[in-house]
Amino acid sequence: MDEHFQPCLDGIDYDDFSFGSHMVEQKEPLMETAVGPYLVIIEQPKQRGFRFRYVCEGPSHGGLPGASSEKGHKTYPTVKICNYEGMARIEVDLVTHSDPPRVHAHSLVGKQCNEAGNCVAIVGPKDMTAQFSNLGVLHVTKKNMMEIMKEKLKKQKTRNTNGLLTEAELREIELEAKELKKVMDLSIVRLRFTAYLRDSSGNFTLALQPVISDPIHDSKSPGASNLKISRMDKTAGSVRGGDEVYLLCDKVQKDDIEVRFYEDDENGWQASGDFSPTDVHKQYAIVFRTPPYHKPKIDRPVTVFLQLKRKRGGDVSDSKQFTYYPVVEDKEEVERNRKKVLPQFPQHFGGGSHMGGAGGAGGFGAGGGGNLSFPYSSGLGYNNLYSSSPHPVGCGYQGGVQMKAASERDGDDRQAPTESTYCRELQRHRHLCHLWLLARRNAHALLDYSVTADPRMLLAVQRHLAASQDENGDTPLHLAIIHEQTAVIKQLIEVVVSIPSQQIINITNNLQQTPLHLAVITKQPQVVQLLLEAHANPTLLDRYGNSLLHLALQAADEEMLRMLLAHLASATPYLLHLPNFQGLLPVHLAVKAKSPACLDLLVRKGADVNGVERQGGRTPLHLAVEMENLNMATHLVKKLGANVNSRTFAGNTPLHLAAGLGSPTLTKLLLKAGADVQRENDEPVSPSSVRVPSSDTDGDPEEQEQEQAMELGEPALSPHPTPEEEQEEAGPRQRLHTALDLTRSQKVRDILLQASQPSPPILSCPPPPSRNHLLSLDTDALQGLEQLLNQYGSGSDWMELAKRLGLCSLVETYKTTPSPASALRSYELPGGSLGGLLEALDSMGLRGAVRMLRKPEPLEKLQSTEVKEDSAYGSESVEEEQAARLKPRPVPEGELPHSQQQQQVH
């Protein structure tokens, strides 16, 4: 048997798998033609479920199984040389999972393997099949990875030569090893099979085209598990996208997973669900928002597919169906009610319509001066008077309030009942009297209306009908608001409120909408004011739990919101802190509406700028960061003072979200506003959840454990303990995710790393002020300071102060503004100190301004000035210390005055 190893094939151009002349000295041409010999894989290796092992763990319990291996029927990776009979040599080694395949740091071990990490089998002359039944994968540690890679690359270079490597070749090998270490995935390998046939000299040098197996995943790697969708809370959503879906799945890596939507047709449309690493909960649940469908307008539901997909490996789960439905433009059904066909009245008064007879004063009857027709109905009331009936109630009359006798009516219009009793006649008589009085009252109302032209005369006698509802549950007041009949609305309100103990003004329709809700939805501030002044209940909610404030903010209606907040009175605090059925407060909807003006109105009235929604505990700042709305986030942080370190129910701060989204601008904004870069959320860091950024860092706890065991000469535990067992045995607290652990952007990573390092001290600058001495100017103080600065001439005005505070770049910007001294806000925001401002004013001779800024100090701070500080050198009052600090110190030679040392703020 010829044990001379042929060159490794990593120098091959894998597009056509041809050898380079520098690798092999060919004695005969390759025997590969259309009908020549070739190598084929008969049984692929099993892709998942096989564990790579470290040296200290010993050999594997059984070799790498085949893809079709089952209990009771074992199979193993198998290859065959076709179109050839004779002796042949088949070698198998490990290569990377990416193309082109390159040498892998791991090695093969087993009975057929050598120290170089390759396995060899001799086949022929008849049976050309080779089965590798005892293959194992030896897992290299990151600590030893570099040396092993250089050794393998050296053997590859010198395999077919006996010469020594030059310095240039050694440097080239080291660079290649470093590059491979950066890109190589230690949890995935592939088998490369290469067949060698005998040449004329009897040596195995004629190489056939190599074949590469399917990827083999290390079973202990999170990426090795099969992707599976277990459950979703929604299977349908709007064609516009943006619907929030909760998806339960098997274990995934939060930085290597996406939710793919696609259509399996000729169009090939696909899109990804929108979520960040912070939306992946404990690696078993994903909260994502659906992408918009590629056709924004559809007339019927469309079914697509969704699946989980790994970004790096490309593995996918089984597909699930998802349905996009058309947009419901008129969700509140306002437009539908506006388009309803109204009854058509005849142009003449010839009668016949159930809405009124001829010659009569708007009665119900046969018309033409006809007779009265009052069929008895025991259920007569205002709720069924509007409903049409095959026997309409008649109450027509001629020229005056006259009615024919009941006996005459009975004789003319209907046949006498066969069974008539005294009680029945009495009941009928009472009913007829009631209708007669009603007709007389209506007639008088019509006469009064003819004299005064006031519609309220007609409505007053019909006020008991104001609570009647149509098939949608809408009252006359609902319909008047829907059709924006302002004059009718005023008249109906005046009539309705005159009913004692009435609640007609608060009646809801079938959509749980009150007239007040519809007035807000249809954007009629004047009507809303009328209803509120008529004591309509502003705290009632619609079917989605939305209050009046929610409805106004959903439409981003600043005018409506301003009017509501001005007239809600005692209900304002309750509504400002009332969530809807989705758990959103009004401040959250203001952020979603991208309206800083609405947000200012809410906060000014007492809304909590740090209020949390009920689903995930997000504040308005969390939502602004999720929306990547820099303007809104800046407004919340700088103007409204939102807490940049607030935490969701999962412990995520806005900085976690910004880092997860990979937004450098939002990250810088939050860090500048005081976000804690070391703040952790509630999810423990697992070995697989954090990717090691540096190739020189060995951050795998499992590998460190294995290496420590090898150094101590102790056998490693096998099988490997579960994460739950490791957590129980762990003594110290497990580290949780910081923003740095969640970012996928190198720019954001650099920003966070820089922020996490302590700033080097600057000798020429005073130490940063403590939190107790930070500058905080209210509007009154700023206006007072501006008046003092403008009283003096050049050299002591606000421009000179700006120069002394290092704000020279802002002088031209604020020069033409109504309040130039507001440039001090740019000194205040990054943490400018009160002491620095007082010293600058004192050096300009503005003692009055110094006294004004000192005056509003808190009582406890003034009391603290009387406290003496003891030391071994005596006692000195804090007041004297402050006076000494404010006194201009002598300037040494070569040093600039303090006014020129201030750091310039841009």
Curated annotation (Swiss-Prot):
Location, primary (coarse class): nucleus
Site (Cleavage (when cotranslationally processed)): A439, R440
SUPFAM superfamilies hit by this protein: Ankyrin repeat, DEATH domain, E set domains, p53-like transcription factors
Role description: NF-kappa-B is a pleiotropic transcription factor present in almost all cell types and is the endpoint of a series of signal transduction events that are initiated by a vast array of stimuli related to many biological processes such as inflammation, immunity, differentiation, cell growth, tumorigenesis and apoptosis. NF-kappa-B is a homo- or heterodimeric complex formed by the Rel-like domain-containing proteins RELA/p65, RELB, NFKB1/p105, NFKB1/p50, REL and NFKB2/p52.
Other noteworthy facts: NF-kappa-B p100 is one of the high-molecular-weight proteins complexed with the v-rel oncoprotein in transformed chicken spleen cells.
Domain notes: The C-terminus of p100 might be involved in cytoplasmic retention, inhibition of DNA-binding by p52 homodimers, and/or transcription activation.
Keyword Metal-binding: no
UniProt cross-references to Gene3D superfamilies, sorted A to Z: Ankyrin repeat-containing domain (1.25.40.20), Death Domain, Fas (1.10.533.10), Immunoglobulins (2.60.40.10), Rel homology domain (RHD), DNA-binding domain (2.60.40.340)
Motif Nuclear localization signal, residue numbers: 336-340
Source species taxonomy: Eukaryota, Metazoa, Chordata, Craniata, Vertebrata
Protein name: Nuclear factor NF-kappa-B p100 subunit
Positions of ANK repeats: 472-501, 511-540, 544-573, 582-611, 616-646, 650-679
UniProt GO molecular function: DNA-binding transcription factor activity, RNA polymerase II-specific; RNA polymerase II cis-regulatory region sequence-specific DNA binding
The Death domain, residue ranges: 771-857
Renumbered residue ranges of the record's region GRR: 345-374
Posttranslational modification: While translation occurs, the particular unfolded structure after the GRR repeat promotes the generation of p52 making it an acceptable substrate for the proteasome. This process is known as cotranslational processing. The processed form is active and the unprocessed form acts as an inhibitor (I kappa B-like), being able to form cytosolic complexes with NF-kappa B, trapping it in the cytoplasm. Complete folding of the region downstream of the GRR repeat precludes processing.
Biased composition annotated in UniProt, kind: Acidic residues: 697-708
Entry GO CC: cytoplasm; nucleus
